[in-house]
């Protein structure tokens, strides 16, 4: 046993070991103490070691403190009496008086006077001698009483030749005195730490002036009934620091504390100084400070922020003190640090929306009972505290999905139906766009059904081959277009009330009719949209590298660009019968195929059934996009781009469009921004609720498909938001063992590294996952099973990771996009670089991660979260 090695160690080594364990490793300290008690008295050679160890242990109990105080008081009285008697004897003998008087002076507690030169009488000497004997007797009685107290409280072995009573009581007194000194010092430091900081408000040391911009405006004034025109200079309000020493001092304090409030880890390295300068620039722009004030604040902040104050140093000392570390140890246990790391499980959710009880939905009993797991699994160390869940496959969720996603658009307990388009508005305003697409596409061939079947994975492939054989014997008929819906099992970020979504596929026989015509010609039709707009418009066919460059090029077309995000609320639900017929007109114009035309006509009226639990739901709807149709994605892009092109034409503006179905971003000149104020009313005429986002005036703030442009080594690339870390740390796949978890981590990491080479934070996260998986090799089929459709679109077949250095330029661009400054980026990257993600399967459902979302500036309610 390790403790036995200490028996032969030196006294200093044993003392150091005990001190270290007592301050840092309490569990080992208590184990060591228990071991000492076990070996005590068993072997005489060990007793000396035990006594020495107990002599070094300072775990003081309450009764000892009282005894130590009384012992110290009595010992001082004895020493004072002894030194006084010694002085009197010296004065009587007239030898060594000075030394005796000095000794008495140092030991006297005050109140006893003894002149330096006098000759005491015999009676005085006897009286002082008797007093000393009395004090010694009282002290002896006290020690007997104290020894009995120790035997009662600690047992007979505690006080011994190595740990005698007087040494123990002196040790207790010293420890208690030290504790009092520490308490006084702590109170002093506490008073300094919690003293209010005198920081004046910005408005108190600045003033606002109006200055000429150099531009002129025409002003019309009426004089004597006649209008007179003349030019006046355009004035602009500018804030500046007042020209006084007090104002400059206040400004210095203000900017220092403001920057430290943003980031308290900044120092004097190149990246920190660049970060400080950017913070000052942002503050200056926010408060419209003049250039002189910005320059002054930058100079001050560059000098004052990197240099720690005494308060900063003391704060760090307090946080890293042994006592502070000891207090954090129990919290590490309570927060499950260490032993709850791994893959945890969260159960599904029930939608909070009430059932409306629509008569259009028929619910019948007698169906086969279906049980579908809705558990979601997540890596406890990297999920950022973001809660993702999947909807339960329950009757309640099914009814909510049908009522809220198919029939109604309201969020309350009343049935509010989607708006209807104006009569013939698609034909009247978008007929030219339809004809342009047909003309651009030209001839499209019909592909063999076998090719369609072979484009799917093994399970679906067999079903399609069976459908092909069926079509050879039984021709296509209308029943093949019937829909069997099911709840979509997907990750939902639980930040607001959610209505689950439906997947509404038709039969494989139906899909063969559409797929052989539309699936393999989709890119050709999408490029036709680009041709009509005059630039790449549908960006879903490009990887995130190419998307970033396209969007940057669109942005650079305008002198003063602005980006307006547009999102069609629940697009599929708002696709009307009129919109479908307009879309189908494009396909029919391209192919001229009667079988395709018949199949498309069957999309107008949809007979839908849905099985959930032991119930069957039946409902019928005219119009509406069925999300399982092969033409869902392409059709939505055609409709949205057609409406946008007609809108641009109506406004007569030059604008660029970035489209990915129902998600759009309009880029135009800032002078045209006001023209788009009527967008909601315009699209309402087409039957769509179009939600516009707040315009942005910086390229890095443009958000498209939950990504933003970031300049990586001088080239713009679309980079996913930081909350993607939490999303990629969750999976809907079943994980049976650690090998499954490592395969999942490897698949996510390999794709993530391809997309995020050279990207701050994200590259380190995916490297961490890949390293933790043991660099496990996984098949292409498994990768496609793990990654989402959106990630697959961003990759566009890329599988090669090209290592790219993270430059300061990239860090500054990432900061502009996501609000995480370069120093925080480095801190997060160091965390991931030193982290090994556990693949252990855990039974617990809720844990708190080390790295939480607030450090990455992830808002609790993101504007892009769908209802």
UniProtKB/Swiss-Prot annotation:
Top-level taxon of origin: Viruses
CDD domains, alphabetized: Luteovirus_RdRp (cd23233)
Keyword Nucleotidyltransferase appears in the UniProt entry: yes
Catalyses which reaction(s): RNA(n) + a ribonucleoside 5'-triphosphate = RNA(n+1) + diphosphate
Biological process annotations from GO: viral RNA genome replication; viral translational frameshifting
SUPFAM superfamilies referenced in this protein's UniProt entry, alphabetically: DNA/RNA polymerases
EC number: 2.7.7.48
Keywords from the UniProt entry: Nucleotide-binding, Nucleotidyltransferase, RNA-directed RNA polymerase, Transferase, Viral RNA replication
Domain RdRp catalytic, chain residue ranges per copy: 561-676
One Pfam family, short name: RdRP_3
Record GO terms (molecular function): nucleotide binding; RNA binding; RNA-directed RNA polymerase activity
Keyword Magnesium attributed: no
Function: Probable polymerase.
Family: Belongs to the luteoviruses RNA polymerase family.
UniProt-recorded name of the protein: Putative RNA-directed RNA polymerase
């Amino acid at each position: 046993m390790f403790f036995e090695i200490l028996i032969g160690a030196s006294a200093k080594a044993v003392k150091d070991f005990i001190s270290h364990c007592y301050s840092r490793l309490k569990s080992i300290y208590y184990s060591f103490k228990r071991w000492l008690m076990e070996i005590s008295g068993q072997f005489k050679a060990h007793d000396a070691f035990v006594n020495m160890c107990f002599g070094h242990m300072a775990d003081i109990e309450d009764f000892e403190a009282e005894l130590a105080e009384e012992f110290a008081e009595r010992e001082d009285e004895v020493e004072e009496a002894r030194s006084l008697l010694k002085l009197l004897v010296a004065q009587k003998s007239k030898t060594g008086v000075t030394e005796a008087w000095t000794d008495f002076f140092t030991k006297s507690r005050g109140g006893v006077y003894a002149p330096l030169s006098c000759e005491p009488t015999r009676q005085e000497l006897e009286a002082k001698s008797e007093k000393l004997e009395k004090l010694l007797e009282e002290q002896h009685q006290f020690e007997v009483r104290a020894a009995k107290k120790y035997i009662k409280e600690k047992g007979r072995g505690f006080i011994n030749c190595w740990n005698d009573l007087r040494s123990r009581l002196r040790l207790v007194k010293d420890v208690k005195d030290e504790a009092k000194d520490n308490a006084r010092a702590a109170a002093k430091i506490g008073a300094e730490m919690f003293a209010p900081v005198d920081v004046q408000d910005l408005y108190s040391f600045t003033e606002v002036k109006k200055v000429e911009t150099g531009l002129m405006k025409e002003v019309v004034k009426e004089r004597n009934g006649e209008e007179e025109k003349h030019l006046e200079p355009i004035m602009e309000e500018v804030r500046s620091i007042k020209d006084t020493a007090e104002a400059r001092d206040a400004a210095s304090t203000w900017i220092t504390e403001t920057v430290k409030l943003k980031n308290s880890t900044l120092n004097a390295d190149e990246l920190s100084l660049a970060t400080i300068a950017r913070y000052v620039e942002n503050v200056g722009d926010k408060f419209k400070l003049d250039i002189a004030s910005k320059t002054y604040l930058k100079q001050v902040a560059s000098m004052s922020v990197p240099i720690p104050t005494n308060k900063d140093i003391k704060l760090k000392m307090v946080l890293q003190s042994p006592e502070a570390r000891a207090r954090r140890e129990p919290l590490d246990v309570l927060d499950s640090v260490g032993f709850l790391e791994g893959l945890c499980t969260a159960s599904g959710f029930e939608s909070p929306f009430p059932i409306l009880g629509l008569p259009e939905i028929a619910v019948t009993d007698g169906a086969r009972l279906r049980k579908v797991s809705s558990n979601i699994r997540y890596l406890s160390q990297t999920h950022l505290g973001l809660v993702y869940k999947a909807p339960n496959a329950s009757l309640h969720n099914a009814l909510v999905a049908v009522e809220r996603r198919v029939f109604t658009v309201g969020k309350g307990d009343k049935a509010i139906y989607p708006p209807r388009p104006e009569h013939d508005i698609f034909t009247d305003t978008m007929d030219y766009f339809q004809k342009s697409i047909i003309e651009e596409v030209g001839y499209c061939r019909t592909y063999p059904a076998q090719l369609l079947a072979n484009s799917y994975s093994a399970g679906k492939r067999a079903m399609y081959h069976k459908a092909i054989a069926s079509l050879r014997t039984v021709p296509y008929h209308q029943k093949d277009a019937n829909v069997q819906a099911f709840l979509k099992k997907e990750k939902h970020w639980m930040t607001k009330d959610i209505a689950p979504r439906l997947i509404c596929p038709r039969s494989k026989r139906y899909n063969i009719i559409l797929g052989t015509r539309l699936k393999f010609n989709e890119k050709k039709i999408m490029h036709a949209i680009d041709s009509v707009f005059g630039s790449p418009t549908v960006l879903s066919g490009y990887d995130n590298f190419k998307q970033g460059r396209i969007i940057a090029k669109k942005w650079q077309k305008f002198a003063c660009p602005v980006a307006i995000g547009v999102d069609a609320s629940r697009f599929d639900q708002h696709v009307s019968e009129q919109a479908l017929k307009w879309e189908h007109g494009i396909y029919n114009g391209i192919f001229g195929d009667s079988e395709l035309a018949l199949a498309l006509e069957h999309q107008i009226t949809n007979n839908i059934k849905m099985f959930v639990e032991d119930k069957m739901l039946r409902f019928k709807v005219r119009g509406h996009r069925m999300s399982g149709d092969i033409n869902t994605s392409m059709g939505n892009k055609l409709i949205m781009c057609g409406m946008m092109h007609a809108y641009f034409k109506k406004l007569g503006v030059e604008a660029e469009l970035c489209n990915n179905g129902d998600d759009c971003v309009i880029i135009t000149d800032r002078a045209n921004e006001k023209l788009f104020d009527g967008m909601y009313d315009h699209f309402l005429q087409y039957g769509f609720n179009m939600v516009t986002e707040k315009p942005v005036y910086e390229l890095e703030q443009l958000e498209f498909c939950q990504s933003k442009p970031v300049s990586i080594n001088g080239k713009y690339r679309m980079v996913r938001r930081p909350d993607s870390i939490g999303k990629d740390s969750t999976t809907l796949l079943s994980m049976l063992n650690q090998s499954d978890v490592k395969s999942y981590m490897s698949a996510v990491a390999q794709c993530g590294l391809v997309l995020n080479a050279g990207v701050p934070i994200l590259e380190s996260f995916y490297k961490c996952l890949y390293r933790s998986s043991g660099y496990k090799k996984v098949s292409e089929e498994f990768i496609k099973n793990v990654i989402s459709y959106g990630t697959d679109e961003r990759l566009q077949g890329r599988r090669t990771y090209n290592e790219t250095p993270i430059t300061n330029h990239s860090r500054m661009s990432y900061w502009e996009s996501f609000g995480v400054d370069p120093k925080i980026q480095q801190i997060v990257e160091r965390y991931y670089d030193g982290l090994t993600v556990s693949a252990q399967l855990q039974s617990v459902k809720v844990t708190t991660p080390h790295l939480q979302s607030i450090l990455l500036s992830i808002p609790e309610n993101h504007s892009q979260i769908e209802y």
